[in-house]
Regions:
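Loop/turn elements at helix/coil->beta-strand transitions in domains of secreted/extracellular proteins
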Residues: 83-87, 113-118, 145-150, 180, ...
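Amphipathic alpha-helical repeat scaffolds
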Residues: 91-95
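N-terminal "domain-start" segment that seeds a small globular fold
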Residues: 43-80, 100
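Residue-level signal for well-ordered, solvent-exposed loop/turn and beta-edge residues enriched
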Residues: 3, 74-75, 191
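Bacterial N-terminal signal peptides
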Residues: 22-34
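N-terminal secretory signal peptides that target proteins for export/translocation
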Residues: 1-17
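Structural microenvironment flanking redox-active thiols in thiol-disulfide oxidoreductases
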Residues: 98-162
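Thiol-/selenol-based redox modules, centered on thioredoxin-like
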Residues: 164-167, 171-220
Length: 220
């Protein structure tokens, strides 16, 4: 058996053997690095995906990071899908003197949707004028008025029980819905910027001028 000290001395005296030893060491080191990279690869890709998801979530204003239920099938809809749009948020009711505003809201949506306007309707019985049967709300909205903009299941819009979106709208604008068909405008950055009472019709110039102003502004 060769003594370790003699083996080292032999390597020093023979350059070829020394060069070969260094090559073997380098190959082993490279193999270890490659193995570590392969082992970390899926995790690294997973981390990248996680960062991408986090970035997407971060691009959604907190005011819109709310889950609501779609009227038609009660599927969960996160309002982040409307980030970057100008939003007209309205609390609605089926048995109100202003119910006919559904027609004007649909016209408004049809006129401006290609420029980035989305009307979001939230039926509510806070003022005692909404149908208890969801199917009746659907019939009124989709059959009677031919509504195509998003409508959600009945939800509270006033007081401590108001849904998270309306709590934000009320806090930011300082105006709570005093009646059905109160209207809030939200800019492309998710910031509530204006509120209009029920008697302001959807095609009222005061409302349409503000919509056009917001549509002309880019997301910042």
């Amino acid at each position: 058996m060769t003594h370790p000290a003699r083996k080292t001395l032999a390597l020093r005296r023979d350059p070829r053997r020394l060069h070969m030893a260094w090559m073997i060491t380098a190959l082993v080191a490279a193999s270890l690095v490659a193995f570590q990279a392969m082992a970390a690869g899926p995790g690294a890709r997973s981390d990248a995906r996680t960062l991408e998801v986090a970035d997407t979530a971060g691009s959604c204003p907190s005011s819109l990071n709310v889950d609501m239920h779609k009227l038609q099938d009660e599927s969960v809809q996160n309002l982040c899908q409307y980030a970057g749009k100008v939003l007209l948020v309205v609390n609605t009711a089926s048995y109100c003197g202003y119910t006919r505003q559904y027609e004007g809201l649909e016209k408004l949506y049809g006129k401006y949707r290609n420029r980035g306007l989305v009307v979001l309707a939230f039926p509510s019985n806070d003022f005692g004028q909404e149908a208890a049967d969801k199917s009746k709300i659907e019939t009124l909205c989709f059959n009677t008025y031919g509504v195509k903009f998003p409508i959600f299941t009945p939800t509270p819009v006033t007081g401590n029980g108001a849904n998270p979106l309306f709590r934000t709208l009320i806090k930011t604008t300082g105006q709570a819905p005093a009646w059905n068909f109160h209207k809030y405008l939200v800019d492309r950055n998710g910031q509530p910027v204006a509120a209009f009472p029920s008697n302001v019709e959807p095609e009222d110039p005061r409302l349409t001028r503000e919509i056009e102003r917001l549509l002309a502004r880019p997301t910042t």
